[in-house]
Swiss-Prot record:
Taxonomic source organism: Arabidopsis thaliana
GO molecular function, a single term: serine-type endopeptidase inhibitor activity
Protein name: Serpin-Z3
Protein task: Probable serine protease inhibitor.
Record-annotated site: Reactive bond: 351-352
Region (RCL): 337-361
Keywords: Protease inhibitor, Serine protease inhibitor
Gene Ontology CC entries for this record: extracellular space
Pfam families xrefs: Serpin (PF00079)
Length: 389
C-alpha cells in the first residue's frame, strides 16, 4: 500500500474517532480537541509489542498494513523541518517500567532507535505518587508548559492503577505556528456566538478582509488558514455548517463519507466580504481507551496477556495488557497563530457563489490542523462555546 493511501485511510479512521469522541461529550456542551496523531503513535507502539493477533487487530483498526507504515507517517512530518522561531512541531516518547521488570531487547531497541524514547525504571508499587509526578513533569516539559498534568496525584483510582502497573508508555505532540497572514489585532471585536441551545455569548472575533482559501459546498463552507512554511505546509481548516444547528449533520457527513477530509480542501484564494472567526483557548481530556473499545478495538485491553513482546518479568511479563489510555490536548488560536499540544498515556497492567462570500464562524463548527503535503492530521476538534476555556 502506498503511503499516501495509508494516510488517507488513517484520516477516515480519524473522522470516525472524532465523531465517537464528540458524541460521548457533546451532551456536556464541551469544546473538543485531540491529536489523532498522538493516539495513533501510541497504538503503533502497542502493536509493536503485541502478539500477532492483537497486532493485526490494531493495524486493521488503523487501516494500515504494518507498523512500518505507521512509523513512516509520523516521520513524514516530524522530520525535515527547518529551524525557525515561528514554526515548531515536536514529538516525544516516554517509557516508565517497574524496577522488577525489564524491556525485551527488541522492544527496547525499537523504542530507543525508532522512537528516540526516554526510558526510566521506577517503583510503581511503593512510590506511585512519585511516578505520577515524574510523568507530569515529562508532559510539562515536552508540551512547552501547555499540559502540566496528565495523571492526577489526588485521584485514588489513578494512584491504585499506577501502583498495580508494570509499564507506562507516553507520547507528546507540541505544535506552534504563526499564520502566513496574521490577523490585525486592532480589528478584533466582541460579537455574538450562537450556542446550540439558542442562547448567545459575547466572544472576541478576529477579522480580515483579505482574500481567503474558502470554498462553499452543499450545506457547509470550508476555510483553510495556512501557517508559515518550511519544507512542510501546515494549515488550519474550519468546517462551518450553513445552519446554526447544522453541526451534527456535518459531523455525520464527515465520518461516513470516505476521503471527506482529503477531498474538501480549498485550493484557491477568493475575495471575501468579511471573515470572522473566534479566538480560541481551551483544553480537553478523555479516556481514549473507552472510546477505542466502543469502536471495536478490544484485544489490547483484555487481561489475557496479549502484549507479549514488551516486557520480561519474573511474575507477569506474559500477562501484560493496557489498563487505560488517557489523552489530553489543548489549543490556543489568536491573531498571531496557533499553539497546540497533546499527550497520550497508556498504562499497562498485568492481567457555488454569486457574490463575494462571508465566512462568519458565529456558531458551532469543526476544525482540523493538517500537514498539507502528507495529509496527516495533527489535531481535530469542535467548538461549541468559545467563551469556555
Amino acid at each position: 500500500m502506498e503511503l499516501g493511501k495509508s494516510i488517507e485511510n488513517q484520516n477516515n479512521v480519524v473522522a470516525r474517532l472524532a465523531k465517537k469522541v464528540i458524541e460521548t461529550d457533546v451532551a456536556n456542551g464541551s469544546n473538543v480537541v485531540f491529536s489523532p496523531m498522538s493516539i495513533n503513535v501510541l497504538l503503533s507502539l502497542i502493536a509493536a509489542g503485541s502478539n500477532p493477533v492483537t497486532k493485526e487487530e490494531i493495524l486493521s483498526f488503523l487501516m494500515s498494513p504494518s507498523t512500518d507504515h505507521l512509523n513512516a507517517v509520523l516521520a513524514k512530518i516530524a522530520d525535515g523541518g527547518t529551524e525557525r522561531s515561528d514554526l515548531c512541531l515536536s514529538t516525544a516518547h516516554g517509557v516508565w517500567i517497574d524496577k522488577s521488570s525489564y524491556l525485551k531487547p527488541s522492544f527496547k531497541e525499537l523504542l530507543e532507535n525508532s522512537y528516540k524514547a526516554s526510558c526510566s525504571q521506577v517503583d510503581f508499587a511503593t512510590k506511585p505518587v512519585e511516578v505520577i509526578d515524574e510523568v507530569n513533569i515529562w508532559a510539562d516539559v515536552h508540551t512547552n508548559g501547555l499540559i502540566k498534568q496528565i495523571l492526577s496525584r489526588d485521584c485514588t483510582d489513578t494512584i491504585k492503577e499506577i501502583r498495580n502497573s508494570t509499564l507506562i508508555l507516553a507520547n507528546a505532540v507540541y505544535f506552534k505556528a504563526a499564520w502566513s497572514r496574521k490577523f490585525d489585532a486592532k480589528l478584533t471585536k466582541d460579537n455574538d456566538f450562537h450556542l446550540l441551545d439558542g442562547n448567545t455569548v459575547k466572544v472576541p472575533f478576529m477579522m480580515s478582509y483579505k482574500d481567503q482559501y474558502l470554498r462553499g459546498y452543499d450545506g457547509f463552507q470550508v476555510l483553510r488558514l495556512p501557517y508559515v512554511e518550511d519544507k512542510r505546509h501546515f494549515s488550519m481548516y474550519i468546517y462551518l455548517p450553513n445552519d446554526k444547528d447544522g453541526l451534527a449533520a456535518l459531523l455525520e457527513k464527515i465520518s461516513t463519507e470516505p476521503g471527506f477530509l482529503d477531498s474538501h480542501i480549498p485550493l484557491h484564494r477568493t475575495p471575501v466580504d468579511a471573515l470572522r472567526i473566534p479566538k480560541l483557548n481551551f483544553s480537553f481530556e478523555f479516556k481514549a481507551s473507552e472510546v477505542l473499545k466502543d469502536m471495536g478495538l478490544t484485544s489490547p485491553f483484555t487481561s489475557k496477556g496479549n502484549l507479549t513482546e514488551m516486557v520480561d518479568s519474573p511474575s507477569n511479563g506474559d500477562k501484560l495488557h493496557v489498563s487505560s489510555i488517557i489523552h489530553k490536548a489543548c489549543i490556543e488560536v489568536d491573531e498571531e497563530g496557533t499553539e497546540a499540544a497533546a499527550v497520550s498515556v497508556a498504562i499497562m497492567m498485568p492481567q457555488c457563489l454569486m457574490r463575494n462570500p462571508d465566512f462568519v464562524a458565529d456558531h458551532p463548527f469543526l476544525f482540523t490542523v493538517r500537514e498539507d503535503n502528507s495529509g496527516v492530521i495533527l489535531f481535530i476538534g469542535q467548538v461549541l462555546d468559545p467563551s469556555k476555556h
